[in-house]
Amino acid sequence: MFVFASFLGFIALILVVQLVRLAIIVPSRQGGERLALAKVQRGSILDRQGRIMAITTRLQRVSVWTPSVTSPEETVRQLAGTLGMPADSVLNILSSHDGYAVVKQRITPEESAALEKLRTDGKLSGVKIEDYYGRFYPQGHLASHVVGYLGADGVALDGIERTYNDALAPPPVSTDTDPAFGDQVVLTIDLDIQYITDMIARDAMQAQKPDSLAILVMDARTGEILAYSALPDFDPNEFQQDSPRIDPDALKNRPVTEAYEPGSVFKIFSLSSLLDLSVITPLDRFNASDVYEKKFSSREVIRIHDLAPYGVITPQQIIEFSSNVGAAYASDRTDNESFFNMLSLFGFGKPTGIPLQGETSGLFKPVSQWSARSKATIAMGQEVAVSAVQMLAAATVLANGGILLRPHLVRKIVSPNGIVIKELNREPLRQVVSSGTARTMLSWMETATLPAGTANRAAIDGVRISAKTGTAQEASRKTGTYSAENFVASVMGIFPTDDPRYIVYVAIQNPRGLQYYGGQIAAPIFRSVALRIVDQVGIPRAGTKTAIPSSEQEAPPPALPAAIGDTMVDLTGVPKKLLLPLLLRKDLNVTIHGAGFVVRQTPAPGAKIEPGSTIDLELR
C-alpha cells in the first residue's frame, strides 16, 4: 500500500517535470493568450514528503464546432462510445449549442488516441482535441476534504485550495511573456498513513453502513495531522468537468463542521479536570452498585444508570468500565463554575483554528444556562457538543504533559524557487492540567484496554495503548429527546502510553450493523490503524503485554466482583467483557456460556451467595 502512494507521487513528479518543460517551450497556436496560459501556473499542494496532491498541468478536452458536423448521428455514436458517455448526453450537448461546444473535459490519453484515429479516418468532422491547463489531483479521494478543489472556472472553492488561495495563486502578469508561478503549500498529511486510514475507513463503511465515518491521526508531539479520512468523500478531479457528478452529502467536511455529543470518551477530560482540581484522588471510592439519583427543590430529578452494577469503584475504574454513575458522583465533588472553567481550557466551545472552512465551535453552554442536572450529565459526555477535530486537539493535553497544542494541517509554504517563505511549527497554547494529571489519566486509559475494560478490542500485544471508547445517543434538535436508533460510536487512542507519539480518533455516525457500541466497532478500527502505524514506523513491541505501573495506587482497587456480596445481583444484559473479572474469584465457581450479553443466570437475583457457590451464566 505504501508503494502505491509512493508510485502516485512518482507519476506526479513526472508531471511536474513535464509542466516546467511545457511552460518554457509550448508554442502558441492562438496568440499571446495561449503563451500566458503556459507560463502562469498555480502552485502545487504536496504531502509532508513532497508527494503531489494538487498540480496545474496540461490536460485535453474534446470540443465540437457544430456547423462543421456532417453526420450528426454517427458523430454522437462515435463520441459516446469512445468517451464512455450516454448517447443522450452527447446529443443534448451538441443540440444545445449553435457553434462551439465542449463535450468532455480531462479526457484520458487512451480516449485522445482513439479520437485522433477516428479524426484521421475522416469519421469525426468538426471534432477537435484541445490542450488546456487545469488542476489535477493525482491522489484522487485521498484527503480530499483537506486538499479541497477548484471549479472548472479555476476558482478555489474549498479546503486548502481556498484557505491558501492567496499563496497558491500566481501574481498578476504585466505582459503575456512574464512568467508567474504560485507558491507551493506543503501539508502535514503523510500519504502512507492516509492510505492506511482510507482503506480501513472504506472497509468499515461497507461493514457498518453508517451515515459517516472519520478517522483522524495526529502526531502527538507536534499537533500535526497525519491522516484525515472523512467519509463519504469525493474525487476533486470531478470539479474540472462542466457538470461534476458529486453527491452534495459527500462535500460535507464533518470532522470540522458538525458537532455531536461525544459520550463516554469525554470522561477522560471530565475526570482529568476533577483530578487537577484536587477534588478526587486515585484512591477515592464511589458506589456504582445502583442508580445515581438526585432530587432538587425545583422538583427536577436526575437518574443515571450503568450497563451493569460495578460495585464500589475508583476513578481509574470509572474510566476502565466507563461508569456513568461513577462519573456523576465524582462530579458532585466540585462546583459548576470550576468544572466549566477547567473543561473550557481543553478548548471545548471554541473553534480550534484549523485552516478549513465552516469550523464549528461546538456547544458548551455557559454556567448561567445549566440546569440542575447539567454537571452530572456533562461529566459523562452529554449536554456538550464537540467536533472530531476538537476532540483530537483536546487529547494533545494528555499526550503533552498537560499542554494543549494547536492542530496543524500545513507545514510550510515554499516559493517557486524553493525558498521557505513560512514554516508552521509546534504551537503550544496553554497549560491545561499538570503533567502528573496527564500521566495519571493515560494510565487509567490504559486499564480500559485490559480484558474487562471497554476498550479491550483496542489492545495491541507488546505496545502500551491508552484508549477510551464512547457510545452516544443522538439528540433530536426538534424534540430535545435522545434517539433509540441513532448513535455515535467512537474511540480515542494514544500510544505508546509511556511516550505518546500518535493520537488516533475514530467517530462513526449512525452505524447500521448489528453492533453500535464504541467498544464493539470503533475500538477494532483504532487497533487496525495503530497496528499498521506500529509496523510502518517501527515502534518497538515487547514480547508480552507490558504491565501497567501503579505508583499512584497503593492498593489494588476492587473490580466488578465487588458488586456481588452475600446475595446474587441481576446480571441480565451485562456484556461478557464486564463479566471476565468474575472468573478471577477464587471463592466462586463461575461458568460463562456463549458470547454477547447475559440472557439467563443461575442462581436467580436475590439468592444467597456463599463461598464455593456456583454461578452459571448464559450469554447470547
Where are these regions (language model features)?
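Periplasmic/cell-envelope proteins involved in peptidoglycan metabolism and beta-lactam response
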Residues: 1-241, 259, 337-350, 358, ...
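Beta-lactam-recognizing serine transpeptidase/beta-lactamase-like catalytic domain environment
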Residues: 54, 220-264, 269-508
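Flexible hinge/switch segments at interdomain interfaces of large molecular machines
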Residues: 167-178, 363-368, 553-556
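Bateman (tandem CBS) regulatory domains
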Residues: 177-183, 248-255, 564
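Conserved "repeat-terminator" motif of extracellular CCP/Sushi domains
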Residues: 609-620
